[in-house]
């Protein structure tokens, strides 16, 4: 028996998220089906986490066990031949049988992209949130600094979040301008449901002048979801990398 670790890139536009569910096609479902076709046996993928419908990934990590003695290249090449063109296996490596993609993850890097221009971009529409009014980047950067460290992020989670604790540690939160895009990079030890999207929505409201940068500490202390920013739409979010 061996365990194969996959690094997966996907465009989440056409899927009901990562995790297998009764209604809707998911990325996990398609990869498991492709593996079953390749190996002639049912396969269960275990992942580093999950992404919601419409969210993308450059570096989702998942692993599965198999007794097949195929070369590693055969797993990536074989899957890429079977999967649709909006899902790709970037790499396949052998991992210890004890490897747990979720429990062993030390941190994750997410990126949220805002397309900040008067006119919408057809090419950017599936990978960014279009906001017309000019955003104040310096105000957003000032607000972003308050998220760094260990905090209770109860005010920055979805109402249906089932996490046992809402305390999380963020190592860095940055905001940068790249042409007509505003890039928000968030690196942390763990995340609550919709946490990055609510942080992005809050920073956008700061950039629009709707919130003060110094309001963030109070929002964190309050634990009040209604007081924080809107949940930014899913298409702007991408899981960039999982660190072990």
UniProtKB/Swiss-Prot annotation:
It holds the Pfam family PseudoU_synth_1. It comes from Geotalea uraniireducens (strain Rf4) (Geobacter uraniireducens). It comes from the Bacteria. GO terms for biological process: tRNA pseudouridine synthesis. It is an enzyme of class 5 (isomerase). One of its GO terms (molecular function) is RNA binding. Homodimer. Its EC number is 5.4.99.12. Disulfide bonds: none annotated. This is tRNA pseudouridine synthase A. The active site is at residue 52. CDD domains: PseudoU_synth_EcTruA. It catalyses: uridine(38/39/40) in tRNA = pseudouridine(38/39/40) in tRNA. Belongs to the tRNA pseudouridine synthase TruA family. Formation of pseudouridine at positions 38, 39 and 40 in the anticodon stem and loop of transfer RNAs. Keywords: Isomerase, tRNA processing. Substrate binds at residue 110. InterPro entries: PsdUridine_synth_cat_dom_sf (IPR020103), PsdUridine_synth_TruA (IPR001406), PsdUridine_synth_TruA_a/b_dom (IPR020097), PsdUridine_synth_TruA_C (IPR020095), TruA/RsuA/RluB/E/F_N (IPR020094).
């Amino acid at each position: 028996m061996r365990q194969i670790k996959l690094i997966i890139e996907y465009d989440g536009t056409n899927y009901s998220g990562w995790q297998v569910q009764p209604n809707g096609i998911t990325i996990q479902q398609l990869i498991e089906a492709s593996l079953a076709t390749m190996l002639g046996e049912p396969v269960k993928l275990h992942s580093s986490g999950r992404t919601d419908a419409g969210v993308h990934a450059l570096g989702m990590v998942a692993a599965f066990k198999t007794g097949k003695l195929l070369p590693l290249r055969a797993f990536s090449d074989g899957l890429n031949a079977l999967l649709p063109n909006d899902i790709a296996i970037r790499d396949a490596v052998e991992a210890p049988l004890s490897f747990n993609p979720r429990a062993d993850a030390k941190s994750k890097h997410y990126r949220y992209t805002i397309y900040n221009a008067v006119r919408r971009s057809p090419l950017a529409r599936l990978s960014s949130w279009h906001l017309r009014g000019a955003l104040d980047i310096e105000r957003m950067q000032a607000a972003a600094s308050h998220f760094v460290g260990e905090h209770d992020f109860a005010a920055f989670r979805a109402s249906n979040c089932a996490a046992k604790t809402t305390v999380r540690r963020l190592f860095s939160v940055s905001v940068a301008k790249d042409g007509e895009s505003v890039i928000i990079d968030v690196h942390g030890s763990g995340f609550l449901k919709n946490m990055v999207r609510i942080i992005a929505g809050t920073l956008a409201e700061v950039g629009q002048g709707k919130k003060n940068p110094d309001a963030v500490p109070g929002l964190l202390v309050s634990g009040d979801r209604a007081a924080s920013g809107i949940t930014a739409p899913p298409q702007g979010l991408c899981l960039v990398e999982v660190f072990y």
